[in-house]
Amino acid sequence: MVTYAGKLVLAPMVRAGELPTRLMALAHGADLVWSPEIIDKKLIQCVRKENTALQTVDYVVPSKVQTRPETLVFRTYPKLESSKLIFQIGSASPALATQAALKVINDVSGIDINAGCPKHFSIHSGMGSALLRTPDTLCLILKELVKNVGNPHSKPISVKIRLLDTKQDTLQLVKRLCATGITNLTVHCRKTEMRNREQPITDYIAEIYEICQANNVSLIVNGAIRDRSHFHDLQANHWKNTNIGGMIAECAERDPTVFDHTSKPSEDGPSWVVACREFIQWATKFDNHIGNTKYMLSRIVPGKSVFFQYFARCKSPEEVSFVLKQLNDDGSAQTDPSEYLENCRAQEKALKNANAIAKQKRKQTDHIGSDTKKQKVVPLPTDI
């Protein structure tokens, strides 16, 4: 069974936590990686498929329209993730959480419940940080997962929360959660209304850890951890405990190499150039959706760089690859790819117009054929 104590891990992040980011983080020393939050009902709809071309396991929602492709919900690469992937589920129902977890349990290393996300898409159905206001439901979800999923499959169940309004309320909740049978507790050291630009509250991490330790539950702390060097400094000088783990979110989104055990300056240019090139390699290898690739590049590439706009104008992996070839080691542009991108848009427009004309012609042909069928043949008189 996977262990969490003292580990430095990649946070669950919607959009940013897809396969290329997770694999890049693992390649640079992340001990564990979390999947993005997947809602229970969405996962239950999925069909599991083994992608032999990519050697991945894909969870897809079949299309209701035969001409439309299926929707990829989650993709994992067992060769590198099999023992290091924690799957996060968004749920407000013990039954649905259990059903969803059973669907994916054989392809992941553990199940985590999201009880900390304050975004509307999580809380509107009682999920995410809304569960902090319904602790009875949260505890029941965890107990059911431990009983019906974790124990039978020898896989850990964990939960990620935020701080409550008071220290006393937080510690009381931690006691209840640790009594459910979970293996790990992740605490985002900010209250629900706090934003990431605000400094995390770390005054009573030691007391949270004591409760966890008494229940044989490991503790991971999330909030403003920059990289592995910073994590080790927190363990040694602030938390004074090497058994407390750390979770990196925003800094890993901007640069998934922050898990490296060494922080030596790269000889290949600015860190964002190195990260950009490597991320595109991972994205290309695993057929990442162009929208997600562009999102991650918008996080990795500085806004002041001309390449921020160049990548934003791309609409295909081929265009991303072309733009990347123009990127010098120092972050400057070898040539301006604008003309190439404009030609791509012109070709796209021409193809769209050609398809529209062809569609219109088909409609006219179908209309003529329909009118012909409607015409009645008048028989000639028989007495001529």
Curated annotation (Swiss-Prot):
GO terms for biological process: mRNA processing; tRNA dihydrouridine synthesis; tRNA modification; tRNA processing. N-glycosylated. It is found in: Cytoplasm; Nucleus. Keywords: Cytoplasm, Flavoprotein, FMN, Glycoprotein, mRNA processing, NAD, NADP, Nucleus, Oxidoreductase, tRNA processing. SUPFAM superfamilies: FMN-linked oxidoreductases (SSF51395). CDD domains: DUS_like_FMN (cd02801). Residues 363-374 have a biased composition (Basic and acidic residues). GO terms for cellular component: cytoplasm; nucleus. It catalyses: 5,6-dihydrouridine(20) in tRNA + NADP(+) = uridine(20) in tRNA + NADPH + H(+); 5,6-dihydrouridine(20) in tRNA + NAD(+) = uridine(20) in tRNA + NADH + H(+); a 5,6-dihydrouridine in mRNA + NAD(+) = a uridine in mRNA + NADH + H(+); a 5,6-dihydrouridine in mRNA + NADP(+) = a uridine in mRNA + NADPH + H(+). Its EC number is 1.3.1.91, 1.3.1.-. FMN binds at P12, M13, V14, Q88, K160, H188, N222, G223, A224, A249, E250. Residues 359-384 are annotated as: Disordered. The active site is at C117 (proton donor). Catalyzes the NADPH-dependent synthesis of dihydrouridine, a modified base found in the D-loop of most tRNAs. Specifically modifies U20 in cytoplasmic tRNAs. Also able to mediate dihydrouridylation of some mRNAs, thereby affecting their translation. Present with 2650 molecules/cell in log phase SD medium. Monomer. This is tRNA-dihydrouridine(20) synthase [NAD(P)+]. The lineage of its organism: Eukaryota, Fungi, Dikarya, Ascomycota, Saccharomycotina.
